[in-house]
Design a protein with these regions (language model features):
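Domain-terminus/edge residues, biased toward the C-terminal soluble/receptor-binding domains
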Residues: 2-191
Length: 191
């Protein structure tokens, strides 16, 4: 009583589980199995595992208060999506709604990593004349298909030796129009 979660909460938990414990898919993708030497059969209640291309899990549920619920995950290529339905009137409705959301995501969005090219910063009094600057964080963006973001890289004019791997050298900002989609530090690739 008094414990509630939103679809967003469930999606965040599902995302974190899949990101940090991908081995869970060893179990969540099993359609049917048997245990105890074959004397007991198990069927996955997530029907998408059998019938949806790329399905990787995740969890079905039902209570009289919450209705039929599903956190569904699927991967196609490098894109892994989560769809959550809470409060469906029937089991079939939860699967249909998640299938529709996953189809929409795969049809209308793509994973993009901005191309940063070769970026070098001069090193003053160093053994090497320059150091290569690379993004210091994840640069993958889930964007609507057809969106062509702009990339702006701002680097220090020069840095004094010694330079340490991971040392901040500037910033990469990815825009769509006036909106900042991503900002990550540009760091030294090596010492």
């Amino acid at each position: 009583s008094g414990h509630v979660s939103s679809a967003y909460d469930i999606a965040l938990m599902s995302r974190e589980l899949m990101l940090h414990h991908p081995d869970i898919q060893t179990y969540t993708t099993i359609w049917m199995d048997s245990v105890r030497g074959g004397s007991f059969g198990l069927n996955n209640t997530n029907k998408l595992i059998r019938f949806y291309q790329g399905a990787t899990g995740l969890k079905t549920g039902y209570t009289s208060q919450a209705g039929h619920c599903l956190s569904a995950t699927a991967r196609r290529g490098q894109m892994h999506l989560v769809a959550v339905v809470l409060g469906a009137d029937s089991s079939a409705e939860r699967f249909s709604a998640c299938r529709t959301m996953l189809d929409y995501g795969f049809a209308n969005f793509s994973l993009l990593s901005p191309q940063v090219g070769e970026n070098r910063v001069p090193v003053r009094l160093g053994q090497e004349k320059t150091v290569r600057a690379v993004p210091g964080g994840d640069t993958n963006l889930l964007l609507e298909k057809g969106v062509k973001p702009q990339v702006k890289i701002e680097l220090e004019e020069s840095v004094p030796a010694p330079v340490s791997q991971g040392q901040a050298l500037g910033t990469m900002t990815v825009y769509e129009g006036e909106n900042i989609l991503l900002q990550v530090p540009m760091v030294a690739e090596k010492s």
